[in-house]
Amino acid sequence: SGISLNWPLNSEPPSNIIATKAPEVKRVAILARNDLFPLAIAKEMEKSAKKRGLDVVYFEKYAIGTLDFATALSQMKAKAPQWIFATGYTNDLILMRKQMADQRIAAPVVTMIAAPAYQEWIDGVGEKLAQNVTSAAWWHPAVRYNGVGVFGTTENYVKLYRAKYGTQPDYAEASSSAAGVILQLAIEKAGSLDRDKVRDALASMNVMTFWGPVRFGANGQINSLEPPVFQIQNGKTVVIYPDAIRQGDLQLGVGN
């Protein structure tokens, strides 16, 4: 069997943060793009919220290609949610955030996955509407790990990537780079190119990389990754979880 860097992006860390830092937040609204990944995240969020005794007052799906969210947002607003959780891609969530402002929808917490991981989303909605929106990703260039391998630190990886390609790396590109680093480390550890020896070296690996801690479970999936939760504060991405790389605290209040 193979080795995989894929690890489900779950909603437990955001839910834990809200339950701990904002226990007064009880009413959750979920609006999900009707597509495999965004809908899976939304369903996990629903489970995670209910597990903590939160009241999911609204759960709706929107079709791929939706441009007008007015009806869904109006219905959501009527439920007076304290935490709005939306899933989709960059264009979806730029439009949604702007239309939330048009309807003067505000809440203590607004989480959007996965668009705020991209600078394009922050630029698209502007600093004012991005303020205090939270998100999560498998990895983000704002994280800070001091790792082994050819790149060493996250900062160095991001610097080298920007010098080569002229853009910020996202989690897809970083995971590809991490896979190369991990394979190199496994070959060095095995002292061989023999497939079985390299695989055994991978299976027993426990290292820190620019991507984060790397350790694999019996099923071949990475089980050490703590996907960062972050918040846009004053136009910048601030990591608020995990504690080992936390750069700031959760700020409440997302307005118009």
Give the positions of each predicted feature:
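Extracytosolic ligand-binding ectodomains
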Residues: 1-256
